[in-house]
Amino acid sequence: MATLKINDLHVQVEGKEILKGVSFSMSEGETVALLGPNGHGKSTLFNAIMGHPRYKITKGSIYLDDVDLTHMTTDERARAGLFLGLQNPAEVPGVINSDFLRAAVNATSEERVSTYKFYKLLDSATKELKMPFDLATRSLNEGFSGGEKKRNEILQLMLLNPKIAMLDEIDSGLDVDAIQTVADVINKLEGEGKGFLVISHYARLFDLIKPTRAIVMVNGKIVLDGDPSLIKRIDQTGYEFIKAELGINIEKEENKMNEVSIGSCAVRESIKK
């Protein structure tokens, strides 16, 4: 069973320290909710774990089992078994979705997947996600609705078959039925032993996927790591109790960094704007 271990992680973006000593671990078969106010380091943590070059690790380490990922490239981390479902998937005109997905699958597979096998997998996955198959013939995310983009991220997840998946607000832009469909897929994959680290600001998704644990980030640090009851408490009362009970002042949200993410982490080097 694969275990992701983050130890004393410090991360800077454009010279500003965002993460200030983050440590935690999680394993396959576990679903962890990552909570916290906007602008307090959750997405930065995901990008740093995945190896986005704009996020500079100044201290600490990232391990998947006994493999040190800290200085690996994004595509190397994807091959090791990590996946990041993006909050704002970019549109890439001229790159056909199915070609992109097949390149991503082959980039992370030990053996090259034949065209026949790939399209068989693609057909099965799109049906499970209740996606129209013609999305596969269009340019990557171009003209996709917000919900279609998010389903396309889950489609990548299903095809790439990682050990640990990080999902950044995967439920935003989805209607009630689509959230249920995505939750069903997450629950199925968790049952097969996949690990999930999930950011969401809505309790509905967590009600459906039932995390085993909840982590709260404030001011670039983990301030709470406990059971799922934290999710309900925060949904009902917000984050004010953190100041009252832990004596931690919640800094105001600053302007978010503009993130540029192109497609799947598995083929980051293959596609240039």
Residue ranges and their predicted role:
Residues 4-6, 19-21:
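Conserved structural motif at the start of ABC-family nucleotide-binding domains
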Residues 26-28:
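Conserved hydrophobic segment flanking the Walker A/P-loop of ABC-type ATPase nucleotide-binding domains
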Residues 35-37:
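The feature captures the beta-strand-to-loop junction immediately N-terminal to the Walker
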Residues 50:
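Helix-to-loop junction immediately C-terminal to a conserved catalytic motif
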Residues 61-77, 141:
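ABC ATPase NBD Q-loop/coupling interface
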Residues 90-163:
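ABC-family P-loop ATPase nucleotide-binding domains
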Residues 169-170:
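Walker B catalytic motif
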Residues 217, 221-244:
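Conserved beta-strand-loop-alpha-helix hinge in the C-terminal portion
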